[in-house]
Amino acid sequence: MQITEQPSLYDNLEKKSVREILEDINREDQKVALAVQKAIPQIEQLVNQIVPRMKQGGRIFYMGAGTSGRLGVLDASEIPPTFGMPPTWIIGLIAGGDTALRNPVEGAEDDMSRGWEELTEYHINQKDTVIGIAASGTTPYVIGALREARKHGILTGCITSNPNSPMAAEADVVIEMIVGPEYVTGSSRMKSGTGQKMILNMISTSVMIQLGRVKGNKMVNMQLSNHKLVERGTRMIMEELGLDHDHAQKLLLLHGSVKQAIDAYRYSQDH
């Protein structure tokens, strides 16, 4: 039996108090970070292969169904506001399309050919990377996409919670995050989903840092989409250049990003 389908270590959940349930879930969640830690060498291997491809104009495609697909779309959607990258650089695809973000689409994940068909609509090429996400490691939508991508010489990776899965057989880099049985038997939105989110954070953040989208520890390319972020950017410029608030904010709004504002100011001081 797959680990993700094994019975929970806990039983008679309906007889437990709220406090007991919360403590049980928290106890299980503490296992997730340790499982992710064990997978760091494989995560590193994947990132090290992604970065040179992206420097040549490559993209990352996350592919999943259900919770796994939603998490891929979520991570991809955070890249433009956080790092100021175009939304075409990291793309999340979910079985059933955007409708499936809110509502289950019956049978969508069982279509072995649909995933690759969607990738071809993006004119996928050998500079790109496809990362399959599936706790079970058995999702046909993902497996079919990885298989075809690999045939076309495209880098493939996968994130799964079961060892030696069919999905892993189709990936160049296999990230196995073995978190054990779920608190509610088979509910892989729980520990598996938490671990997937952690790994996706690690992949996208480390890639963006390697691509120069962070300076020091700051999001110097973030989009200025609300007052909070304008103020954060203003503080970054104040700290970096020693300017007062009004001068820093004027520079920021003039140039549109922290990085461009700092670069423009330093250029003006040197010339």
Residue ranges and their predicted role:
Residues 1-35:
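Cofactor-/ligand-binding subdomain signature composed of acidic, glycine-rich
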Residues 28-38, 104, 130-132:
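Short, basic, glycine/proline-bearing loop/turn elements
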Residues 38-53:
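A short, well-structured juxtamembrane/interface segment
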Residues 41, 45, 140, 194, ...:
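Charged, alpha-helix-enriched surfaces in structured cytosolic catalytic cores
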Residues 58, 154, 243:
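Short glycine/serine/threonine/alanine-rich loop segments
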Residues 61, 65-198, 207-211:
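Glycine-rich phosphate-binding loops that contact phosphosugars or nucleotide phosphates
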